[in-house]
């Protein structure tokens, strides 16, 4: 029987209290690369959440039958299989977004969040809790991606989901887009500000010297 308190903890804790990007500093590379648009940030969130949740679930199901010496290989095979499925579904039903995400869908295989949850939680916990832990960490990753994508697309182009929100001067409006926000380094600064804001609200997250 699944423990409801544990499910609630693993589902909600990664959102802010133990965010994989803001606190654990995992999955930063893809956060820089796929957040120029809110649409790609949301699709990447969905892809990572599905892969993390189902890989944790399947790994937890067979955890007692995996020899310790090959556990990382088994985890990688399961994760890679799920990533291939997600990649093929995106190519079939969202080809343009798949092209924009480029190699970063494939690189979910090596995402530290996915591997980390498989090794640290799924190998020691029941399947339902592991599945919910995967969803929680995927959503925690997604919260940062969506916030960064929102700021970068709006400030960088005056659009959200490709729809004009702030009329630019090129089209007779008042807004002058800041192209710097469409470059990867801008995501570093936005993530840094989010980490600062989160640790200001939650001082317990500040590392002790």
UniProtKB/Swiss-Prot annotation:
Which UniProt keywords are present, listed alphabetically? Answer: Cell inner membrane, Cell membrane, Ion transport, Membrane, NAD, Sodium, Sodium transport, Translocase, Transmembrane, Transmembrane helix, Transport, Ubiquinone
Q: Which family does it belong to?
A: Belongs to the NqrDE/RnfAE family.
Q: Which PANTHER family does the record associate with it?
A: ELECTRON TRANSPORT COMPLEX PROTEIN RNFE, NA(+)-TRANSLOCATING NADH-QUINONE REDUCTASE SUBUNIT D
Name-wise, this protein is: Na(+)-translocating NADH-quinone reductase subunit D
Q: What class of enzyme is it?
A: translocase
Relate the assembly described in the record.
Composed of six subunits; NqrA, NqrB, NqrC, NqrD, NqrE and NqrF.
Name the encoding gene, please: nqrD
- Name the residues that span the membrane: 42-62, 66-86, 103-123, 131-151, 178-198
Q: Which GO terms describe its biological process?
A: sodium ion transport
Name the predominant localization. Answer: membrane
Name the catalysed reactions: a ubiquinone + n Na(+)(in) + NADH + H(+) = a ubiquinol + n Na(+)(out) + NAD(+)
Against HAMAP family, the record matches this protein to: NqrD (MF_00428)
Extent of the signal sequence: none
Q: Where in the cell is it found?
A: Cell inner membrane
Q: How does it sit in the membrane?
A: Multi-pass membrane protein
Q: Which InterPro entries match?
A: NqrD, NqrDE/RnfAE
**Function per UniProt:** NQR complex catalyzes the reduction of ubiquinone-1 to ubiquinol by two successive reactions, coupled with the transport of Na(+) ions from the cytoplasm to the periplasm. NqrA to NqrE are probably involved in the second step, the conversion of ubisemiquinone to ubiquinol.
Species name:
Yersinia pestis
Tell me if rRNA-binding is a UniProt keyword of this record.
Answer: no
Select a single GO molecular function from the record's annotations and give it: oxidoreductase activity, acting on NAD(P)H, quinone or similar compound as acceptor
EC code(s) of this entry: 7.2.1.1
Highest taxon above the source species: Bacteria
């Amino acid at each position: 029987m699944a423990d409801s308190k544990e499910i609630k903890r693993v589902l909600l804790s990664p959102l802010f209290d133990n965010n994989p990007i803001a606190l654990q500093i995992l999955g930063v590379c893809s956060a820089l690369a796929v957040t120029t648009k809110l649409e790609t940030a949301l699709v990447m969130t969905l892809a990572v959440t599905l892969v993390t949740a189902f890989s944790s679930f399947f790994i937890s199901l067979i955890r007692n039958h995996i020899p310790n010496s090959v556990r990382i290989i088994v985890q990688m095979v399961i994760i890679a299989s799920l990533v291939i499925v997600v990649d093929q579904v995106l190519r079939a039903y969202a080809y343009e977004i798949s092209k924009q995400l480029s190699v970063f869908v494939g690189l979910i295989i090596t995402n530290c969040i996915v591997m980390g949850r498989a090794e640290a939680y799924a190998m020691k916990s029941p399947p339902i809790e592991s599945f919910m832990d995967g969803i929680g960490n995927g959503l925690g990753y997604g919260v940062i991606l969506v916030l960064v994508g929102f700021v970068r697309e709006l400030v960088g182009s005056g659009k959200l989901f490709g729809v004009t929100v702030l009329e630019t001067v090129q089209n007779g409006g008042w807004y002058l887009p800041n192209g710097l926000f469409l470059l990867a380094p801008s995501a570093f600064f936005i993530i840094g500000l989010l980490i600062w804001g989160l640790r200001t609200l939650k001082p317990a997250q500040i590392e002790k010297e």
